[in-house]
C-alpha cells in the first residue's frame, strides 16, 4: 500500500508540475497573429506603371482567388522611396490567417496559376517576361505578435 501511495503522490506531483508550466505558458504578454509575406520589388526605370498594371490585374486576381479559397486574409501594395538603386520601390504584402494556411502552397499556387494564366507553363513564362520591367529583391515571411 505504501508503494502505491508513493506512486500516486509522485503522479500527482508530476501532474501539478505540468499544470504549472502550462499555466506559465498562458502568461505570455502576446498571442500569435496573422502570418505576413512581404515581397520586395524594384521596378526598372520607366516601368513603374507597367508593373503596377500587372499588379492591378493579374496579381490582384491571384490574391482574390486565394482569398476566396480561404488561404489569404488580405493583401496590399505599398510604395516606398528607395534609398539606393538596390532598394525596393514596391512591397507586395499578403496576410494569411496562420502558418497552416501555407500548407500545400505549391498545389494551391498551381491551381490559381491555371485559373488566372491558363496553365502553370504560361504563368512561368509571364513571370520570366516581367524580368524586363522589375527585379524581385527577395521576400520575408513573418508572424504578427498581438500584445495583450
Spans of features found by a protein language model:
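Bacterial N-terminal signal peptides that target proteins for export
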Residues: 1-11
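Short hydrophobic/aromatic beta-strand micro-patches
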Residues: 42, 93-95
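Sec/Tat signal peptide C-region and signal peptidase I cleavage site
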Residues: 19-25
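Immediate post-signal-peptide N-terminus of mature secreted/exported proteins
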Residues: 26-50
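Bacterial N-terminal signal peptides
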Residues: 10-19
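N-terminal, post-signal-peptide region of Sec/Tat-exported proteins
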Residues: 44-88
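An amphipathic, aromatic/His-enriched active-site/gating alpha helix that lines ligand/cofactor pockets
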Residues: 27-30, 61, 65-73, 95-143
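Short beta-strand/turn micro-motifs at beta-sheet edges
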Residues: 25-29, 78-81
Amino acid at each position: 500500500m505504501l508503494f502505491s501511495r508513493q506512486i500516486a503522490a509522485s503522479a500527482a506531483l508530476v501532474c501539478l508540475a505540468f499544470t504549472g508550466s502550462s499555466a506559465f505558458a498562458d502568461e505570455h504578454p502576446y498571442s500569435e497573429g496573422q502570418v505576413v509575406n512581404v515581397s520586395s520589388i524594384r521596378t526598372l526605370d520607366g516601368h513603374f506603371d507597367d508593373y503596377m498594371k500587372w499588379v492591378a490585374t493579374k496579381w490582384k486576381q491571384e490574391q482574390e482567388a486565394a482569398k476566396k479559397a480561404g488561404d489569404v486574409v488580405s493583401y496590399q501594395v505599398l510604395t516606398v522611396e528607395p534609398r539606393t538603386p538596390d532598394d525596393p520601390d514596391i512591397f507586395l504584402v499578403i496576410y494569411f490567417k496562420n502558418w497552416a494556411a501555407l500548407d500545400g502552397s505549391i498545389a494551391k499556387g498551381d491551381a490559381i496559376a491555371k485559373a488566372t494564366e491558363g496553365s502553370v507553363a504560361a504563368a512561368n513564362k509571364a513571370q520570366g517576361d516581367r524580368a524586363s520591367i522589375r527585379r524581385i529583391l527577395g521576400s520575408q515571411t513573418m508572424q504578427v505578435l498581438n500584445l495583450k
